[in-house]
């Protein structure tokens, strides 16, 4: 008979695969978080924080790579430290410091992040962020992000926990100004293998969002799936869930979701992940009628050659807004091409479109705002000293808003240097 300690800390292959599915396809919960829509080019991306015990390959990920097995220079017993310093320089125009006011600025971002792995089941990441603006219409800021991820298994159950925190400030499209936002997110995942074909995915989520001088909210939700594995690399699921949103200065909301999901690895080179259904929202005050919306999330990955990767992602969600008495209907599509050149250079090209419709959560006759956002990103990078990366980048962002003062066009060029142990 196994001891309780061994049962709780040992990952067999079946439970590891179940937990990985629950963690890595969790984005099919169709994120309802308010979208800050930062105008700036993407900043530091922390290294993968998935604990080693859960780093089995995701069979739906065509782009999965074999984990590195290099010696760990900063390892003491069960503790492994992975610093990931980062620097970015941007020369940007079209940055909104207020409605009808787009300006130019040089932005420098410095981060001294560190990832701590505790044993094989827990990973904790912390990244302080310093942003310096040459234009005095913006404030230099200190921000920070942190995340914790862990998991274990017990008999036919695989259990996971994730916690994240962010406190950042940047020019955003939604507010047409530099806006400080704070976010706390907690997720509890449980997956149960009923038999060789059927399984359950259970999730509880808590999200606290706030924005200085704008609306804030707290949300609690669940989305649960019944999965059936028809054959290897193909499964289908039915899901349902719901939640409650407590708004600081807008009507509170209840909502329900009903979805279907398909995961299909058609070949070693292509995969399809698709989820969709309907969401119903009720406003608990203000007199607005309930909203019934189609929602979906989809990703196609295609790798025709070892050095070429192509993906397309689309989604439609409904989320709370930082603007008072508003929710947003968000529909978007993004395509990304990653190409290795001459064996050492990596070219990444991506473009996207997002339609954001602001819907009143109170009974009013005023017209609603609509934003059409277009983005294009180009980045050429090269590795150095095995663990370092240097890249030059360009970003074009354009927002055509139906509300006066919120439209802009921004061009950004720069470079970034990162190093990950």
Where do the PLM segments sit?
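Gram-negative and organellar
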Residues: 37-421
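Cleavable N-terminal export/targeting peptides
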Residues: 1-60
């Amino acid at each position: 008979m196994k001891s309780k300690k061994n049962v709780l800390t040992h990952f067999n292959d079946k439970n590891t695969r179940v937990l990985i599915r629950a963690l890595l396809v969790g984005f099919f919960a169709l994120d309802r978080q308010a979208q800050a829509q930062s105008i700036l080019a993407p900043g530091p991306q922390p290294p993968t924080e998935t604990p080693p015990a859960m780093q089995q390959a995701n069979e739906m990920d065509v782009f999965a790579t074999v984990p590195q097995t290099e010696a760990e220079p900063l390892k003491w017993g069960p503790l492994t430290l992975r610093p990931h310093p980062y620097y970015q320089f941007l020369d940007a125009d079209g940055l909104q410091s207020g409605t009808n006011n787009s300006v130019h600025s040089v932005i420098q971002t410095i981060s001294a992040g560190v990832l701590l792995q505790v044993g094989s089941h827990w990973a904790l990441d912390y990244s302080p962020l310093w942003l310096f603006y040459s234009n005095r219409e913006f404030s230099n800021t200190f921000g920070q992000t942190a995340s914790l991820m862990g998991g274990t298994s017990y008999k036919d159950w695989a259990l996971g926990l994730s916690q994240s925190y962010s406190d950042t400030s940047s020019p955003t499209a939604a507010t047409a100004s530099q806006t400080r936002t704070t976010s706390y997110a907690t997720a509890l995942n449980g997956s149960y293998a009923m038999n060789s074909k059927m399984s359950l995915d259970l999730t509880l989520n808590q999200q606290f969002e706030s924005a200085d001088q704008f609306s804030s909210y707290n949300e609690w939700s669940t989305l649960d799936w019944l999965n059936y594995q028809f054959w290897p690399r193909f499964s289908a699921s039915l899901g349902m869930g719901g939640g409650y949103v407590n708004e600081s200065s807008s009507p509170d909301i209840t909502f329900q979701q009903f979805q279907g999901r398909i995961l299909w690895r058609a070949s070693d080179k292509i995969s399809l992940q698709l989820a969709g259904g309907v969401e119903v929202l009720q406003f608990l005050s203000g007199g607005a009628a309930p909203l019934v919306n189609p929602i979906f999330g989809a990703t196609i990955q295609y790798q025709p050659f070892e050095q070429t990767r192509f993906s397309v992602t689309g989604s439609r969600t409904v989320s709370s807004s930082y603007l008072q008495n508003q929710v947003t209907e968000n529909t978007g599509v993004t395509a990304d091409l990653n190409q290795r050149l001459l064996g050492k250079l990596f070219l990444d090209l991506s473009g996207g479109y997002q339609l954001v419709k602001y819907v009143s959560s109170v009974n009013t006759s005023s017209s609603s705002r609509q934003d059409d956002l277009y983005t294009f990103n180009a980045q050429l990078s090269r590795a150095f000293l095995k663990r370092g990366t240097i890249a030059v980048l360009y970003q074009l962002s354009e927002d055509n808003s139906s509300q006066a003062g919120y439209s802009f066009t921004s061009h950004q060029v720069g470079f970034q240097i990162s190093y990950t142990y």
